[in-house]
């Protein structure tokens, strides 16, 4: 499918379903380093803010998940249990539980308050690389190096469906805001949209050439999909039309599956880590780089945006091992 930016992309893209569009939009963000979180002993793999805004969870190659205070970066607790490195962690909608994906071929469901592992989800035949809850948080989705996507029931820990999704490792999986659709990305160069109830593939987004898809995510309102590919490119798709609306470049991403994000608490930005040790922030509309955050000493593998405040968390690989919290006053 052609990925030339369609003419109607000049129309403003409303990302969030809330009615806060009338806010004064700042010219540029002005994120500055607030604090550095030290605790992991190997590469950090993922950072995620809890939906209630209170906590930050980080996962690492050290097999641990650490919970931190979202605003002050204060160490809260460590979750132990995986046998091999963890690639991803995700929160339930009520911020009470976490799911983690590990090279030990399992996912674990955690009770955050007690720090206990509630269930271990077994069924993948290779590394589990990515995971997410659906909005009601009764289902978990996972993607693996076994090239499948699995849908799990939280209550029982049973696998409900296995989607023979891709012909290479699955790099990312995400539910839309209603929980009716799933998006998956893979090293096979494809981004696929699935019906969550039936497990049917509804659409495949195909790029001009087929660079590996390293990350995918629905926009907050579910109308768009953000994809990252290992040719130093992020793209915003109107997936119902199969059209690429925006392309974001300037960062470095050819090797790692780096998390990207929509920032909607101030202006409308796209935020991503990069292999040149920086966090990049683009204006969603104009595609201009509006800020680069400097401070990490290795690849920034993950960047997360706080649900209500102008806060970004970033995490870096093994020459750094830290998480940084960045704050903007507008």
Swiss-Prot record:
SMART domains: WD40. Belongs to the WD repeat WDR5/wds family. One of its GO terms (cellular component) is Set1C/COMPASS complex. InterPro entries: G-protein_beta_WD-40_rep, WD40/YVTN_repeat-like_dom_sf, WD40_repeat_CS, WD40_repeat_dom_sf, WD40_rpt. Keywords: Repeat, Ubl conjugation pathway, WD repeat. This is WD repeat-containing protein 5B. Residues 1-26 are annotated as: Disordered. PANTHER family: TRANSCRIPTION INITIATION FACTOR TFIID, TRANSCRIPTION INITIATION FACTOR TFIID SUBUNIT 5. May function as a substrate receptor for CUL4-DDB1 ubiquitin E3 ligase complex. Residues 1-10 have a biased composition (Basic and acidic residues). WD repeats lie at residues 39-78, 81-122, 124-164, 165-204, 208-249, 252-292, 295-330. Probable part of a cullin-RING E3 protein ligase complex containing CUL4B-DDB1 and a substrate-recruiting component (DCAF). Interacts with CUL4B and DDB1. Gene3D superfamilies: YVTN repeat-like/Quinoprotein amine dehydrogenase. It holds the Pfam family Beta-prop_WDR5. GO terms for molecular function: histone binding. The gene is WDR5B. PROSITE patterns: WD_REPEATS_1, WD_REPEATS_2, WD_REPEATS_REGION. Residues 11-23 have a biased composition (Low complexity). A motif (DDB1-binding motif) lies at residues 188-192.
């Amino acid at each position: 499918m052609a990925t030339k930016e369609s003419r109607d992309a000049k129309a403003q893209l409303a990302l969030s379903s809330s009615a806060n569009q009338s806010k004064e939009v700042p010219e540029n963000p002005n994120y500055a380093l607030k604090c550095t979180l030290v605790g992991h002993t190997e590469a950090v793999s993922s950072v995620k803010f809890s939906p209630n805004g209170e906590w930050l969870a980080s996962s690492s190659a050290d097999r641990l998940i650490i919970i931190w205070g979202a605003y002050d970066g204060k160490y809260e607790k460590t979750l132990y249990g995986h046998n091999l490195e963890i690639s991803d962690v995700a929160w339930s909608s009520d911020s009470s539980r976490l799911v983690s994906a590990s090279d030990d071929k399992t996912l674990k469901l955690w009770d955050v308050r007690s720090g206990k592992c509630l269930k271990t989800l077994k069924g993948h035949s290779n590394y589990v690389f990515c995971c997410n809850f659906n909005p009601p948080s009764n289902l978990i989705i996972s993607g693996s190096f076994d090239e499948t996507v699995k849908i799990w029931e939280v209550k029982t820990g049973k696998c409900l469906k296995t989607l023979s999704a891709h012909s290479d490792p699955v790099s990312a999986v995400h539910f839309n805001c209603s929980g009716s659709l799933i998006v998956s990305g893979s090293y096979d160069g494809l981004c696929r949209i699935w019906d969550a109830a039936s497990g049917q593939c509804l659409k495949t987004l195909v790029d001009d050439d087929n660079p590996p898809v390293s990350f995918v995510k629905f926009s907050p309102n579910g109308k768009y999909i953000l994809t990252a590919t290992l040719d130093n490119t992020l793209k915003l798709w109107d997936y119902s039309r199969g059209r690429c609306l925006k392309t974001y470049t300037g960062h470095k991403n050819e090797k790692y599956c780096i998390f990207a994000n929509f920032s909607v608490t101030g202006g409308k930005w796209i935020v991503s880590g990069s292999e040149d040790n920086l966090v990049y922030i683009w204006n969603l509309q104009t595609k201009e780089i509006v800020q680069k955050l400097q401070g990490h000493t290795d690849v920034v593998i993950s960047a997360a945006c706080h649900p209500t405040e102008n806060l970004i968390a970033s995490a870096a690989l093994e020459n750094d091992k830290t998480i940084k919290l960045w704050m903007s006053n507008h």
